[in-house]
Amino acid sequence: MQCSGASHATPGAPYFTEFVEGRRGEILDAALAVFATKGYECGTMREIAAELGVTEPALYRHYAGKEALFADLLGAAGDQVVLRASAVIDALDPARVRESLLGLISARRTHVPHDDSTKPVMQMLFTAAPRNGAFREVIRGHLAGPMLERLRAFIPRADAYYGIVRSPEETTASLRIFMSLLVGYVITGMMLDVPDDDEGVADAMVAIMGWDATAA
């Protein structure tokens, strides 16, 4: 395994201790710091223990190994994203669909930093997680699945308001496009040094779904 290409960016402020209580939050923050700078493949339990200020055997009393620790990190992060997004998604209003979607898009700024400290973390998530079936299941169970279910509940309400009839297959296909645009915009906003265009993305989402506000 080659680790020469691992990132050496400086991690940002503690993240998990803001919402995960006790020692678990401290361990997850230590793991995040190591994985952000070394990558998942190159980061070690020994380095995480050193970051935390404990011995490696002490860390193993909390987690069976690096995979279990990383899976818990993914799950905790996913749960927090869903918790923060749920209120916004559940409040989406078909009668004000563009404004509601714009609020959903812009809400990310409250919770996602837009600076270089985010890049190594996102690189870690999108390189290590997709190659591991267990990690993919964690992401589905804690992030993708709950988000999809909430949006799946909104789409029929919006469709009914605008007089759109879709088959179950069409709804699933539309939901995938909708999520691809939303998630892709958020991720590229964190990874690329390009200006935001919330208005344009909201317009594109409305157009893709066929929710013409003038129809109301």
Question: For each of these PLM feature ranges, what is it?
Answer:
Residues L104-R108, M122-F126, F178-L182, M205, ...:
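Short alpha-helical scaffolding segments that buttress acidic/His motifs in well-ordered protein cores
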Residues Y15, R136-E137, G141, G145, ...:
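Hydrophobic/aromatic-rich alpha-helical bundle segments in the mid-to-C-terminal region
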Residues P113-G141, I187, M191:
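Amphipathic alpha-helical segments used for helix-helix packing
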Residues E26, A30-A76:
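Helix-turn-helix
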Residues M1-G22, A216:
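N-terminal intrinsically disordered/low-complexity leader segments
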Residues A30, V34, A107, L181-T188:
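Amphipathic alpha-helical interface segments
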Residues D72, A85-P120, P168-L175, A202:
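Hydrophobic alpha-helical connector segments
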Residues V20, L28, L74, G78, ...:
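Amphipathic, non-transmembrane alpha-helical scaffold segments
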